[in-house]
Structure formats: C-alpha cells, structure tokens
C-alpha cells in the first residue's frame, strides 16, 4: 500500500520543480521587500557596535536577533511586532524604539556608554569584511588556545578543592495581579518572593531550590580522572513521588558543568564548541575591544560570536591577561536570539578566575536561563562557588577511602549547613524552603503535580498504589482484537522494601484472560519506587500473556497503544507461561550484574505451528529453562529514571553489555544450548555537525535449538520510528544462530538547514540512519530431514517461508528525515535495500516519532 502511494507521488514530482521555483521566488521577494534594517552605533565614537541584542515581542512571545560584526541588524515585518524593539548591550544604556521609528532599510540607532564596574570597553569594530589572516584578535586567541594546558588546573599533578552549588527553578513572566487568579489563588503567598530576571526584567517566582556541597580530588599518579565526593545535599522536595535523583540529573544536564577551557561545552543536552576550542578559530569571529584593569591585572577585552548565528555557538566577551600567560580572567557567554535551541529565550553564563598560589583558578560560575514552552515560562539559575584549593598529593591520597557520598549526606541539619556553606543563603533563597513546606499542604497544588506525573511517568498516584501504565490500558492486534488492560503497582507508602506489581488483560477477539504478578524486594533504601538508581533488587514473577517472539521492546511492551498501529497484521504470536526469579545489582559507578532463572512454556497462536519436521513431535507447549547472566558497564552514564524505564541523557561514554544464557534440560525443557551476545553503544559529537549514535552487536548460539530460540532480529511493523529496530523488517522475518549488527543514527542538529535563509527560521534539523545485520543459521539449526526434531520455519498460505536466514547478504535499510517539526515531531522516510522479494515486503515508507529536545 505504501509503495503504491509513493509511486503516485513520484509521478507527480515531475510537475513540482517549476512550481517550487516560482513559489520560492515570491517568498524570497516578499522577504526582501519586508525587511527593515539598520545599524547600531556608539554615540561617542560613532563606530558600529557588533553583538547588540535586538529583541521584541510577537503575540506576547519574545523574539529577536543580534547585530553582526559591522553593527547591522535585520528585522522582519514590523506588523508582526507587538509594540517596541529593545536594543541592549553590556556597558550601554538600553534603547527602546517604537516599531514606527524603525520603518526603513537604513535606520541608525545610537547607544550611549554608561559607567560599568569592570571599566567596560569601547567597541572598535571595523566595517571591512572579517578576516582571520593578519587579525590581531585571532592571533591573541591562538596564544590563549596554545596556553590552555598551562593555565588549566588539569595541568597539576595533584589537587583538591571544595565546591558549593546552588540551583533554582522559577515560574516566570508573572505579575502581581495573578496572585488572586487561578491557578495561583490558593498559593498566592509565593508571590511574596517575586524577583526580577537579570536577563530581561521579567518577574519570576521561585518554586524549586537545591544545594550541594562536594569535594573534588585528583592525583595523576593513581587516576586519570578527578573524583568528586558529595558531603551534603538538600533540596525542595516538590513531592515525595518525584524522583529527585533524575530531577537533579536532568537539571544538571540543562545547566551543565561548564569549563571554558574544554574543547566542547555541554549545555541544554547539547554540546557547543567552546570559544577556546582548537576549532574555535574556524567557528567563531573574534574582535579586540579595548584594555582595562580587573582585580590587579591588565586585561584585553575580546568579543566573539559564531560565524553563523544559527549554529550551536555563543556570542560574548572575555578578559585575557596582557602577559605571557594569556589566561582568561573572566568570560561571559550568551546564546544569540536567533539560536536553534528549543524552548530557550535567553541564556547567560559567567565564569571568573582568581590568582591563588601563583595560579589562576576558577572561583565562580554563574548561569541564568529563561525558558519558554507554549503556555509556560520559566527561569533557571545555577551558581557554583569554589574554595579551599590544595595542591598536595598526601591529602588527595586520604580521599581514596571515602565513598562517593558520605553517610547521611542528604540528612544534614541547619547547623551543619550554616558552618560549611562557602556562600550563605540570601533571604530570597531561604524563603524558597519556607514556601515549599507550605505548598506541600495545598490540595490543588498536589493534584496538579500528580497530573503532571501521570502524563510524564504513565502512572496515576492513588496513595499506596499507582495505577498504570496508562498507555497500555487499550490496544489491539490481529490475534486478540481489542485488548483491555488494568495494571498497577505499590510504592513506598505500602512498604519501604517490599513492592508488588501486576496486571490483568482481556482480548475481545480471543476471549482470553492474561495476567502478571510480580513481587520485588529492594535491599537498598528508596525514596518512592523500587527502580530508583542504584538497583539492589530481588524479584519473583509469574505471567501468562501473549507475546511477539524475539521482540525485545526498548521501552514498554507490545501492548503499548502506539504499537497497535501496524502496516501488516501482527499474527505471529505465542501464548507464554513464564516463571522468573531475578536479581539485579548495580554500583554507583554504573556497573551492573543481572542474574536470572526462568521457566518458559510457549503455545503457538494463529498461523504458528510447533510440529517437528518429521511430524512425530508437537511442541505444544515448547518448553525452555534458562540460567542467564548479564554484565553491563556504562561509565558516567546519565539518565532520567521513570517508574520503570530509563531514558539516557546525552551520554557520550560507551556502554558495554555482555549476556550469557544457558538453556538447560534440568527441569524438563526440550533443548539444551548456550547463547552469547555482546553489544557496544556510543555517541559521538562531531563539532558543530551534530552527533552520531552507533551500536554494534554480535551473537552466537552453541547447540541445537528451534527457530523460536534463535536470535530473531528486532523488527518494527508499526508506523512509529524506532532507533533500535529495523523499521521495514517484518516480525519473525529473519533468524540467525550467529550474526553481527550495526546501527548508526546521525543528527545534523540543523547544520544544513541553518544555512538556508528561509528554512533556518523553522529550526528544522536533519537526521539520517543506516542499519545492517548479517548472519546465518548453521546446518545444525536448519530445519530439514537431517534435523527431524526441529520446527519448520513459518510459511504463508501459498507455502512461501515467512522466516528466512541472512546467508545471501546483509539486511540493509537507510533513512533520511526532518526532526524538530513544531519542536516535537520527527518524520523519516525509510528505504529497504535488500531482500525485497520476501513475502509482504514494504520497500519504503514514512515513519514518525515524537521527539522533544532542546
């Protein structure tokens, strides 16, 4: 069906080019005619001013741009601007112009200098085209980059320091009149702590606050990476059923741990090229502004901005010492208004260094972010203070005996905090703790939080029990028809260590009940549910349910609502009776061990037949018993932990997984075998070109098994795109007893579209992928007269085999698509390149997924 539609579209494409050319001509013409442009100049020197923030509101939403290296700016249609345009630059008085004053293509806006605490510079940009050759600013930056190692603390053989972090999240774009309106009417007291954003003057009310005290140690003789020990932590518990570990990780991912000396800067779940990167000379434009004194040093003020303002880069300024060190004393990073980052209106990061013991060491980091999603504005701030630097290997050696988190680190009293804070709380920060205690007792607020958690986590809180997953309540397939399911689980309100979960489901076509019951005991203390990191969990489960053989879904099960939409009927299913005893253990360093003992009975459904080749044995059910051991190592892994599943957060470290399975006849199973599988996953950021996700996997079976116990390759017959599946492969289409697999998904992060004048306004991002698997079924496991006890591969009504091997060639599919459509949708067109003659093959098709990212 899909291929027929595609052929029709292909025929029509012959008529499209002329239409597109005409349409693009009129669009470009309209854009050019509608542009209102001008130049911003210094009122005293009359020099053009680069990197001035030019902001305005469109239907209440903040928009804007930044002047280029020659001080020029371009606005769109003035009719789309609500009222006024604001021109802002550090060290200058803000200028506000009504839109009627900016109608034209040669408007001059004059800005006046004001006194500034750092003796702010005068911009002396030149009008000529930017050049890297013979550019004093570029030559200075080459010296700064060359001295990075010399000036970085990482150059020391041993060091330690203390760190105090304060993180705050607030509701923004508020005013006093909202205090008496829904939804704030019952919590109006939070407006008593209203503050003003230093970025844009918007009012905000803090709702969340977190503090963390830690000590970092490094000794080159014993380790290649620093070690951080958390000594104290406390936060505003928004509610007990929010996973604080995941919340803190997610916020840390948003705000990042920025070091200007790093090659790449992690921020907002992306990686930006640092102005001090070895590639910065190619990515940024640099301009020398002036010299000034800062804390006893003569410094050179240096301005920088991305060569292309839609790229993932910063504009800002830095103070570089005017000596042989060429070290950074202070830096400010900003995102251009025209940046391609989603949901972020403005962001500013500042980092300061101080001279201590003859070294320049980081003393302060401060980051402020203004977010906006439809209907909600938020303000975030993270302030980090450093102190007590020591360069002594003996002190560092003593830290080896300390755990990553000292005992009772999250139970420190006020006296401890008052004594050990590097920087005291401000009155407003203390007020957040007080307001949080009052919020927890307000019923409308609690209902709101529970609703958000039901949407985000999939479960509805009912006290001691959570109902869900909501998404699995209704689904359908060819065997069961409409499937209704009711499930739930207990939480820590029921018992601090013992947890239960389960479900009951019923098919309106097969008239059959399915159910699952599971008991879990957590040896580790948990805040709300048993799956919180790290695991130390023993579980016993029994299940009777329909399954798709060989399909291990990355998140959820086959009865998720989205899995119901399939281009081909799902009729290759079994009814499984499964008893599982499992123990999961993982360390804070992200090394995990999973052991499992399982008894499985599989009954064929629909078109499946489990009769042997010689017709003498009917495996109904097919019995298998296994002992399984899985080792997994994911150094520095970061993830969001929902009630059951983990979603990785911007992991660049490799993930290694090794699984060994022993199928035994000990409990009356039909076959004995050994199965080994290894997997490696890795993400690479490719400068400003986006990132590449790669997974390599291989497996081999030793012994004789029927096709259900082979490696049945992960397919996807739905219309949703899955990163970890072959999206045009049918269920049960290919099986192997030895194979190697490669999957590569690439995101350009808008690198191409950002250079196309009209497309860059849409903030679309290009994606592509290539996936391949090559394997075979050995003669020992091939159903034939030589193996009469094996089960033949399934066939269709015409007698054609619906399951085959990959002996002839690899299975290969590729895709290309557009991500970030409306900031939430990704569309990919997938092409299948091999085995096109197999039954029910779809050669190409459009797939979608919901993908929300910064």
Which residues fall in each region the model found?
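Structural motif
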Residues: 35-49
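Hydrophobic beta-strand segments
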Residues: 52-56, 85, 123, 161, ...
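Structured extracytoplasmic
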Residues: 82, 116, 126-299, 305-313, ...
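Exposed, low-structure sequence patches enriched in small/polar residues
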Residues: 270-272, 401-854
């Amino acid at each position: 069906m899909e291929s027929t539609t595609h052929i029709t579209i292909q025929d029509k494409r012959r008529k499209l080019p002329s239409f597109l050319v005409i349409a693009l001509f009129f669009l470009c013409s309209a854009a050019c005619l509608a542009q209102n442009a001008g130049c911003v100049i210094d009122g005293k020197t009359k020099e053009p001013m680069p990197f001035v923030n030019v902001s305005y509101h469109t239907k209440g939403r903040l928009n804007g741009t930044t002047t280029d290296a020659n001080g020029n700016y371009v606005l769109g249609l003035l009719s789309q601007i609500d009222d006024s345009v604001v021109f802002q630059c550090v060290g200058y008085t803000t200028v506000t112009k009504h839109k009627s004053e900016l109608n034209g293509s040669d408007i001059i806006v004059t800005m006046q200098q004001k006194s500034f605490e750092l003796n702010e510079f005068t911009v002396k940009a030149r009008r000529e085209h930017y050049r890297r050759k013979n550019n004093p600013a570029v030559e200075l930056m080459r010296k700064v980059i060359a001295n990075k190692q010399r000036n970085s603390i990482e150059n020391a053989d041993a060091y330690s320091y203390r760190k105090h972090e304060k993180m705050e999240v607030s509701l923004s774009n508020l005013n006093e009149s909202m205090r008496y309106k829904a939804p704030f009417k019952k919590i109006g007291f939070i407006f008593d702590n209203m503050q003003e954003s230093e970025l844009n003057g918007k009012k905000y009310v803090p709702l969340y606050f977190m503090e963390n005290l830690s000590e970092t140690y490094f000794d080159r003789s014993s380790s290649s990476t620093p070690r951080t020990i958390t000594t104290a932590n406390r936060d505003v518990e928004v509610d007990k059923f929010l996973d604080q570990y995941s919340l803190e990780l997610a916020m840390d991912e948003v705000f990042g741990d920025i070091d200007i000396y790093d090659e790449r800067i992690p921020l907002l779940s992306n990686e930006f090229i640092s102005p001090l990167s070895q590639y910065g000379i190619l990515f940024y434009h640099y301009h020398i502004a002036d010299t000034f004194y800062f804390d006893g040093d003569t410094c050179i003020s240096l301005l920088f901005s991305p060569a292309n303002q839609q790229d993932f880069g910063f504009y800002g300024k830095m103070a570089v010492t005017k000596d042989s060190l060429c070290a950074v004393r202070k830096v400010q990073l900003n995102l251009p208004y025209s940046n391609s980052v989603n949901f972020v209106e403005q962001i500013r990061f500042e980092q300061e260094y101080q001279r201590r013991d003859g070294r320049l060491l980081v003393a302060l980091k401060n980051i402020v972010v203004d977010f906006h999603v439809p209907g909600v504005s938020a303000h975030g701030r993270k302030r980090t203070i450093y102190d007590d630097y020591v360069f002594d290997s003996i002190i560092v050696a003593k830290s080896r005996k300390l755990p990553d988190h000292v005992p009772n680190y999250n139970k420190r009293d006020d006296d401890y905090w008052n004594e050990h804070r590097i920087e005291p709380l401000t009155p407003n920060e203390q007020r957040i703790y007080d307001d949080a205690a009052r919020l927890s007792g307000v019923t409308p607020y609690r209902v709101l939080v529970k609703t958000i958690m039901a949407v985000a986590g999939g479960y509805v809180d009912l006290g001691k029990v959570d109902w869900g997953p909501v998404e699995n309540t209704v689904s359908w397939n060819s065997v069961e028809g409409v499937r209704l399911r009711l499930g739930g689980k207990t939480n820590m309100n029921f018992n601090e260590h013992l947890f239960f979960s389960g479900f009951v489901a019923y098919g309106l076509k097969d008239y059959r009940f399915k159910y699952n019951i599971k008991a879990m005991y957590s040896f580790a203390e948990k805040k709300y549910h048993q799956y919180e990191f790290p695991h130390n969990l023993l579980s016993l489960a029994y299940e009777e349910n329909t399954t798709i053989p060989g399909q291990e879904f990355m998140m959820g099960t086959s009865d998720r609502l989205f899995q119901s939409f399939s281009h081909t009927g799902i009729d290759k299913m079994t009814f499984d009776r499964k008893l599982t005893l499992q123990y999961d253990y993982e360390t804070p360093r992200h090394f995990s061990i999973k052991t499992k003992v399982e008894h499985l009975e599989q009954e064929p459904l629909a078109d499946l037949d489990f009769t042997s080749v010689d017709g003498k044995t009917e495996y109904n059910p097919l019995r298998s018993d296994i002992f399984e051991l899985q080792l997994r190592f994911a150094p520095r892994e970061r993830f969001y932990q929902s009630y059951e599943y983990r979603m990785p957060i911007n992991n660049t470290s490799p993930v290694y997984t090794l699984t060994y399975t022993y199928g035994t006849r000990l409990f009356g199973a039909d076959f004995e075998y050994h199965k080994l599988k290894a997997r490696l996953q890795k993400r690479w950021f490719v400068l400003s070109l986006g990132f590449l996700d790669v997974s390599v996997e291989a497996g081999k079976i030793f012994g004789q098994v029927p096709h259900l116990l082979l490696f049945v390759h992960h397919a996807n017959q739905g219309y949703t795109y899955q990163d970890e599946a072959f999206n045009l492969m049918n269920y049960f289409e290919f099986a192997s007893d030895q194979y190697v697999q490669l999957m590569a998904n690439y995101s350009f992060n808008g690198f191409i579209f950002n250079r196309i004048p009209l497309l860059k306004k849409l903030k679309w991002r290009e994606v592509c992928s290539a996936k391949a698997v090559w394997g075979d079924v050995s003669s020992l496991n091939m159903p034939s007269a030589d193996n009469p006890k094996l089960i033949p591969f399934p066939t269709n009504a015409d007698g054609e085999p619906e399951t085959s091997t990959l002996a002839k060639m690899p299975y290969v599919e590729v895709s290309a698509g557009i991500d970030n459509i409306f900031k939430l949708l990704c569309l990919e067109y997938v092409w299948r390149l091999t085995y096109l003659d197999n039954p029910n093959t779809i050669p190409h098709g459009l797939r979608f997924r919901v993908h929300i990212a910064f």
